[in-house]
């Protein structure tokens, strides 16, 4: 990214990564095509959301990043330029810890990459939970309304105040929800 290269040598490019399968394409592209040309030391990676599972669980957003990208890029180091949401911790405690971490490390995200679920959710904020978008803290605990899986989710303020907020939408399975948002005016977390 040109913006990352344009920053002074000590400035970092802070990216918040979406979860689910959305960023897999990006991770594979980086690992296979740009692993040796990306200035990794200039990037700091944070997460938009995480399921409350350990990183070894297939459902872990950080776990996917680790397997698909960071395991093959030695410059990506947890605690240095990779800051995961600790999914195996209590969601309430982790939302507080991660909120404080982000407040202390990131004035403003350079880029927030969001996905969209087939139901219109983003950042583990589901339809009917739109009030969580206006929570005062950067991260909050959330719960999937059907599976009851606990999660930690970024709220609306960091998304809206990022220098760039990108919805990365892949696959024909997303066409219906995109059509409903754009053409039918569906009100859901992703449309706000």
PLM regions and their residue ranges:
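ATP/nucleoside-binding phosphotransfer catalytic cores, i.e., glycine-rich phosphate-binding loops
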Residues: 157, 163-192
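A short secondary-structure junction signal
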Residues: 95-96, 123-128, 177-181
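A glycine- and small-aliphatic-rich helix-loop capping segment at beta-alpha/alpha-beta transitions
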Residues: 29-39, 63, 67, 127-136, ...
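Class I SAM-dependent methyltransferase SAM-binding "motif I" and its flanking Rossmann-like core
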Residues: 111-157
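Glycine-rich N-terminal segment of FAD-binding domains in flavoprotein oxidoreductases
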Residues: 9-34
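Ligand-binding beta-strand-loop-alpha-helix segment within the catalytic cores
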Residues: 38-113
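N-terminal glycine-/serine-/threonine-rich phosphate-binding loop
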Residues: 1-15, 92
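Glycine-rich beta-strand-to-loop/alpha-helix junction loops that act as flexible
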Residues: 17-22, 114-118, 170
